[in-house]
Amino acid sequence: MSEIPAYTLNDGLDVPAIALGTYNLRGSSGVSSMVSGIEAGYRMLDSAFNYENEGALGAAVRRCGIPREDLRLVSKLPGRHQRYDEAVYTLEESLMRAGLDYWDMYLIHWPNPKRGLYVEAFQALLDARDRGLIRSVGVCNFLPEHLDRVHDETGEYPSVNQIELHPYFPQAAALEYHAQVGVLTESWSPLGRKWRIVEDPAIVALAAEVGVSPSRLILRWHYQLGTMPLPKSGNPERQRENLDIFSFSLSDEQMAAISALGRSDGRQADQNPEYYEEF
């Protein structure tokens, strides 16, 4: 398997070009799944307060035998704790649950714009970074206007914006904007599992043309777009397969064919960040 390339974030932190999503990996089975992911070669694990698995992530880190400094560990602040003091306490408690001294990256999970607290939360995380509790501060599901407001009021853009992105929802405008302001795009649900995109005839045909599985084809598409995909799997074989995307490449025509699958109804659920709220 080829070595995993790295991205350098706008704050100088180096991160691998693909990470292991951990949604629904909880408890002792979740620990085993995360350990198998690390053994497969993943060096970045993406968890969240709302996933209820920060403790499992910490246990996996202690069990895996890989030095802490070689890993990039991530969690997220829930929408119900966006006031300054609440954000700080939630972060501190998450570190206690995981048994960690710091998060490599800590993200605001949703902007929840009706509440109007995401800038306050972002400032709290910047201050926590100054205390050494976080190395990099990012966000999820932010629109350009949310990113601009954060920058205007704090003087900084987030290091990453983790958004829904897959062939049926390619988010070209968001990618272009993120590139303009120096924010790395992370892709959640990169395979669009609700839509079963790996079974799309166009994807199946392209995968056969390239000589790879449909999931590897899609994840390679993400990488060549310049994003960081976060495939989630607890299956060791699937984890290894999803990681093996750096030994081949797609032509411009193949990339365009995948992007052309985008649909107006491509979002998997009614979670438009303009109005959607998650607590």
Model-assigned labels for residue ranges:
Residues 25-37, 83-98, 145-148, 169-170:
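Short, acidic/polar
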Residues 1-71, 277-279:
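N-terminal binding-site loop/beta-alpha segment at the start of enzyme catalytic domains
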Residues 68-81, 104-111, 141, 165:
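A short, structured active-site edge motif that brings together acidic residues
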Residues 42, 100-103, 134, 158:
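A structural motif
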Residues 25-28, 47-56, 80-85, 113-116, ...:
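Acidic-and-aromatic substrate-binding clefts and catalytic sites of carbohydrate-active enzymes
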Residues 111-279:
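Beta/alpha (TIM)-barrel catalytic core signal, keyed to glycine-rich beta->alpha loops juxtaposed to Asp/Glu
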Residues 80-122:
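Glycine/small-residue-rich loop that forms an oxyanion/phosphate-binding "nest" at active or ligand-binding sites
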Residues 9-10, 58-69, 92-101, 127-129, ...:
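Acidic (Asp/Glu)-rich catalytic clusters
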